[in-house]
Amino acid sequence: MSNVLGFGAVGDGVADDTEALQHTLDAGDGVLRLNKGTYRITRPLVLDLTKQGIGAVRGEGGTSRIIMAGPGPAIRVIGDHQGTASPVTVQAHTWKNERFPTIRGIEIVGEHPDSVGIELRKTMKCVISQVLIRRCRIAIQLVERNRDFLLADSHLYDNHEIGLLLDRCNLHQIIVHGCHISWNKVAGIKSLGGDVHNLQIVGNDIEYNNATSGGAIVSPADLAKHPGGAEIWFDATDGTISEVTISGNTIQATVQTGGANIRIEGVPVVRPERADTPKTQTWDTAHLINITGNVLGSQWRGLDLRHVSRVTITGNTIYDSSDLSIFATHCSGIVVSGNTFSWRGLDSEITKDGLRFEDCDNIILSSLSTMRLCAGSAEAGAAVTFIRCSDCGVSDCQILDPLHRGLELEDCLRCRIANNTIVDRREKPSMRHAIRVLGQSRSNLVSGNILGGATVKLIDATGEASELRDNMLLR
């Protein structure tokens, strides 16, 4: 283990220790041990595993600080892993010289506006733990190709743009757990393009990740290309993301217009069709995602989903979404079950919360507990709104005290609204309709609901829009 003081480092936060630290990496045994102190550097420290062999960076239990006063990453780890996670694809030189680099026990502070904390390139089984990275543009950036990455027990805090960035990276088998990822000005965790699969984000506190939080040194105008910040943001408009679990996190906590607690963006994909491909089959670049057991709230939107499929949203507490709790457009195969929404305690509070689905199919809402959802207006929209959707179901939900309407279908086909309670219990009700079906809607079923408290009409569905039966209408 190479002691940096023996290679000429000063560690007083004033002297430029770049040469001494790099000399330690190049001439030492591959393990960079940072004694207690503050090490100022002006260019990246490169741990090139292809040249130096197996390596690591270790601090003294969090007492070791690196100040990055130049552009680029404070620590750059380079490997040459060219395969996947499958053992048969891992080349001998990876196991011999490059596997399992670890970085732990250090703080990295950015002084340059283009500084990055840690960059990983073509690594295999890298583990970053017990680190604090702050005031960098990006805290941790993965590029090109990486496999089996673990980030644990760390703080990515108050960075100018992003906490953890998966940057156009071919990346599988990623676990992020036990971390505090907060006060980053664009996103807490962002996947941008690339080919990302098998991502688990579990047991973290992910908060205040937008330009309005924490006294951003980059003005919101300079971040105009980033729509409002997000705690978790998957952008697969030029790539793919799938097989994702987001579970047991706190994901909140300040509103920026255009922002979201979780934003997932895909695009439709055209694939060669086999003879037996169903005509209704659609493909997209963001799919197979599980969002379970989280607390999400205090943002413009809770979840913002675009061109996403096969998503399960269960057992979450979702609250204080100033625009919408869930917005989904051009999505398919979405299950929203067993969640609670809202709790706008006072009529004097700003209007907020609601669910809206546009141009979607195969959506299921079930066993939801909602109260005082405000989405829509006196003219259009409801607490739960479907527009141009088909083959959707809403069942066994409590939609209590909605501001304008309980549920609205517009231009919808073959949707089923069954066994829900939609009532306005206020002394002076404001709900105009419990259920309204309009436009070119057809072949929809409204059955077995308990409806009450509407100021205009409990069910407004005319013509061939719906079959109505066995509903309890409370006068």
Regions found by a protein language model. Name each.
Residues M1-A20:
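Right-handed parallel beta-helix/beta-solenoid
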Residues M1-L5, R414, L468, L474:
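Glycine-rich, low-complexity segments
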Residues G8, T18, D26-G72, D80, ...:
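N-terminal extracellular ligand-recognition/capping segment immediately after the signal peptide
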Residues D29, L49-Q52, A56-E60, G70, V77-C136, V202, T245-I251, ...:
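Parallel beta-helix/beta-solenoid
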Residues T42-L47, A69-T94, E111-L120, R134-L142, ...:
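Extracellular beta-strand/beta-solenoid scaffold signature
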Residues M431-R475:
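Leucine-rich solenoid repeat scaffolds
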